A protein has these predicted regions:
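Hydrophobic, glycine- and aromatic-enriched re-entrant/interface helices and adjoining loop segments
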Residues: 99, 103-105, 188-281, 302-305, ...
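Transmembrane alpha-helix boundary/anchor motif
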Residues: 60, 68, 97, 126, ...
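Membrane-helix boundary/helix-loop-helix interface segments in multi-pass membrane proteins
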Residues: 1-16, 20-21, 27-161, 325-340, ...
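Hydrophobic transmembrane alpha-helices of multi-pass, membrane-embedded glycosylation machinery
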Residues: 167-178, 192-195, 288, 355-357
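Hydrophobic alpha-helical transmembrane segments
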Residues: 53-58, 274-291
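Interfacial segments of multi-pass membrane proteins
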Residues: 131, 167, 172-186, 250-279, ...
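Helix-loop-helix junctions and helix-breaking kinks within/between transmembrane helices
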Residues: 32, 145-177, 203-207, 272-279
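Loop-to-helix entry and N-terminal half of a specific, functionally important transmembrane alpha helix
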Residues: 296-336, 342
């Protein structure tokens, strides 16, 4: 009865899409991680057990966010955002753990996690709050440059260490700025600035491996042979082997030796091989439903803070899913971006559920929230006309 009360009035389609994606993820992780578990003499369900543990944490966080007053998120983002930046800066210290050519992990001995997953959410909420407070002065140069500064602080520290994640964050924040009604000149400024930053990063000698990835992807030539190009080709073989209906659950061959990141970066390829076109179509359809419902929640929002937050959260999930599936289908160069809700990874799963919880909360309490709270708690947030 209590559970029924909590989920009343929330966006049911978004919730169901999330549930089905998680179920598919648990099944896929079980299958894709089997060779790795066997290689290290672990229990066959080792990775499933760990992922399930993080899922429980994520579900608890989801219900806590749905129940807590919205003002808690609004007020505490003032220190959560700076703390997430500090965690990113720690990647430059000995605590930063290099993996697959990029420093994504922070190893604190007792816990190992990706601070970028926390930054994705905190930067979205922080920028949403700033723009909601200053929506009618955004065309003022100072206000706009402050918003650009928030983007720079969010993307800059992580861009060298984890370029692809920086792009995901940048696109999500850019989507919020677009929704805020920036001028054509401001839009062009952001585009030129983004292209310039990408050029500077790729020109850095330390990022030579990224250039090789791009050249190998574009030319598909043996002159640019690399582990990334090899993985892309093996991923395509997995799609080909899967055909229309797949080879069957646990029967993938590619996951044994040809796809080293089978249960993380290339889990979509394992799904394609074991469940074929039908399986990949279902996954893509679920993400389309999720993204559509997320943007509809943003469209129906009655204050700017809700609107911008929903747009940012939805874009982050959507662009990350697109990048991962695009890499697996070899329409994008290898990025190291995982598939939300499906790929193995504790921090990513928990943060994806937190973002979903925020979307569900906006859908559940939108009208009630905007009727009673803007003056008392969010007095500096403008209600949409």
């Amino acid at each position: 009865m209590k559970l029924k009360k909590e989920i009343k009035d929330i966006d049911l389609m978004l919730l169901l899409a999330t549930i089905f994606l998680i179920i598919i993820g648990l099944v896929a992780v079980t299958s894709a991680s089997f060779p790795t578990a066997k290689k290290y003499n672990l229990n066959s369900f080792h990775y499933l057990a760990r992922q399930s543990g993080f899922l429980v944490i994520g579900i608890i966080a989801l219900f806590m966010i749905i129940k807590m007053p919205r003002a808690v998120i609004y007020k505490n983002i003032e220190w959560i955002f700076p703390m997430s930046i500090i965690l990113i800066l720690l990647l430059w210290s000995p605590l930063g753990d290099k993996s697959k050519g990029q420093v994504r992990w922070l190893d604190l001995k007792i816990i190992r996690f990706q601070p970028s997953d926390i930054l994705k959410l905190s930067s979205i909420i922080y920028l949403a709050k700033y723009l909601a407070k200053n929506i009618y002065s955004l065309r003022d140069r100072k206000t706009f440059l402050m918003a650009v500064g928030i983007m720079g602080i969010s993307v800059g520290p992580i861009m060298i260490k984890d370029f692809s994640t920086a792009v995901v964050i940048g696109v999500a924040l850019f989507a919020i700025l677009l929704a805020s009604g920036i001028t054509k000149k401001q839009f062009l400024f952001l585009v030129i600035l983004g292209i310039g930053l990408i050029y500077v990063i790729l020109k850095d000698p330390e990022n030579k491996f990224r250039i090789m990835r791009i050249l190998g992807f574009v030319s598909d030539s043996t002159d640019y042979q690399s582990a990334a190009l090899y993985q892309s080709r093996q991923s395509l073989y997995a799609f080909a082997l899967g055909g229309y209906s797949g080879v069957g659950l646990f029967r993938s061959r590619q996951k044994y030796t040809n796809l080293p990141e089978a249960y993380t970066d290339f889990i979509f390829s394992v799904i394609a091989e074991e469940f074929g076109f039908i399986g990949t179509f279902i996954v893509i359809l679920l993400f389309i439903i999720y993204i559509y419902r997320g943007y509809m929640i943003a469209f129906k929002a009655t204050n700017y803070f809700d609107k911008f937050t929903a747009i940012g959260m939805t874009t982050y999930i959507g662009i990350q899913a697109f990048f991962n599936m695009g890499v697996c289908a070899k329409i994008l160069p290898v990025t190291g971006i995982t598939l939300p809700f499906i790929s193995y990874g504790g921090t990513a799963l928990v943060m994806a559920l937190v973002s979903t919880a925020i979307l569900l909360k906006i859908s559940k309490e939108g009208t009630l929230w905007n009727t009673f709270y803007p003056v008392a708690v969010l007095g500096d947030i403008y209600i949409l006309p």
